[in-house]
Each structure stands twice: as structure tokens, then as C-alpha cells.
């Protein structure tokens, strides 16, 4: 299994330094999580037939590890009214104090599915089904954003007092996916 989340935040503002001059600031934050499941899977498929109808039930269970890779990047560009441009590390919520990390955690996943099909004639079948997957341990991108920011970091500054914020703490949650499928099969 693999699940990827991405979020980008861009901010642009202008500050007046007098009657006609403006300084422009542009900040960009990028947040990305990539979850990959590695493990063993056990499952069973059972299929029943009755006349032209058939019903298939699928059940799977997997134990293993989820590797959660989190990348947080930010940059600020300042342009003065004289046209001088400077670039600094860190945007607004993405600062040098929270670059993200990679961690592997114990996880389990399960899948359930049911499919019914009907034989219109011996070579042609129609099917419809439902599937559900649950994954116990994933990192979602919005859970990794720390809204607390020490403003000393803005514009490339360093923290001389106060907390090292934003900080990175990996938060995980469960993930549920559902789907409906339809099929058309012709055998020749």
C-alpha cells in the first residue's frame, strides 16, 4: 500500500515604505507525506454460483510496518522597491526548526470486498462490487503542521529566545478507503 499527501501554501504581500515605494514579500510552504506499507498478507476468496449468478467474497489481513516520510520546505523572497531581491530559508509555517523526518512504525491493514456478477450468456458477464480497505498507521499532511511559530525565524533570522517553533512531531491516524467497481467480461 502507498498513500501520498501534499499541501502547498503561498503568500504574497506588499508593505508601503512611504508615499510611492513598496517592498514585496513572497512566502511558499510545501508539506508532503509519503506512507509505504511493507508486510505479509493473509487472505481468502470464496465464490458461490447459482444459475447465472455468482457471488465472490474477499477478505485480507496484513501485518507489517509503515514507513512515513515527511518533507517540509519553505522559502521567503523579499524584493525592495529598488529591485533588490533576497531569498531566505523558511516560509510561514515551514521553518528550519521543522524539516520533517522518516520513521517506520508497526501497522496493520485489512481489506474486505464483495462482487456479484451475472452471466448474460455463456461468454458475457456483468459484475458490480464493493471494497473497503482500512490501514491503521498513516501520517496525513495536515496533521504534521505545527501552527505555532517563533517570529524570530522570519526573514532568515535565528532564534535567540523563546521556543523552537514550529517543531516537528509525527502524528499518525487510521485511513479508510471505500470503492465501488463495475465490470464487463467477454470470453472468446
Tell what function each PLM region has:
Residues 3-36, 66-107, 139-149, 153, ...:
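Extracellular/periplasm-exposed beta-strand and loop segments of Gram-negative cell-envelope proteins
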Residues 40-46, 59-61, 112-118, 128, ...:
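Residues on the lipid-exposed face of transmembrane beta-strands in outer-membrane beta-barrel proteins
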Residues 1-4, 61-69, 132-136, 188:
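Transmembrane beta-strands of outer-membrane beta-barrel pores
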Residues 126-132:
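Internal, hydrophobic beta-strand segments that form the core of beta-sheet-rich folds
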Residues 51-57, 106, 122-124, 178-180:
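Outer-envelope beta-barrel architecture signal
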Residues 38, 108-110, 132, 178:
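Transmembrane beta-barrel architecture of outer-membrane proteins
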Residues 4-6, 29-31, 38-58:
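Amphipathic alpha-helical interface segments within eukaryotic helical scaffold
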Residues 173-188:
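Outer-membrane beta-barrel "beta-signal"
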Amino acid at each position: 500500500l502507498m498513500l501520498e499527501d501534499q499541501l502547498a501554501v503561498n503568500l504574497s504581500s506588499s508593505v508601503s515604505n512611504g508615499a510611492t515605494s513598496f517592498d514585496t514579500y513572497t512566502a511558499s510552504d510545501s508539506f508532503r507525506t509519503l506512507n509505504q506499507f511493507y508486510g505479509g498478507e493473509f487472505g481468502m476468496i470464496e465464490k458461490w454460483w447459482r444459475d447465472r449468478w455468482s457471488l465472490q467474497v474477499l477478505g485480507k489481513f496484513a501485518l507489517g510496518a509503515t514507513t512515513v516520510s515527511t518533507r517540509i520546505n519553505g522559502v521567503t523572497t523579499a524584493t525592495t522597491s529598488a529591485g533588490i531581491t533576497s531569498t531566505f530559508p523558511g516560509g510561514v509555517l515551514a521553518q528550519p526548526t521543522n524539516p520533517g523526518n522518516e520513521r517506520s512504525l508497526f501497522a496493520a491493514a485489512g481489506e474486505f470486498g464483495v462482487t456479484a456478477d451475472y452471466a448474460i450468456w455463456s461468454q458475457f458477464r456483468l459484475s458490480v462490487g464493493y471494497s473497503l480497505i482500512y490501514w491503521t498507521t498513516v501520517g496525513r499532511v495536515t496533521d504534521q503542521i505545527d501552527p505555532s511559530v517563533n517570529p524570530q525565524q522570519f526573514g532568515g533570522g535565528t532564534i535567540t529566545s523563546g521556543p523552537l517553533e514550529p517543531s516537528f512531531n509525527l502524528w499518525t491516524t487510521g485511513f479508510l478507503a471505500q470503492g465501488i467497481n463495475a465490470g464487463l467480461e467477454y470470453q472468446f
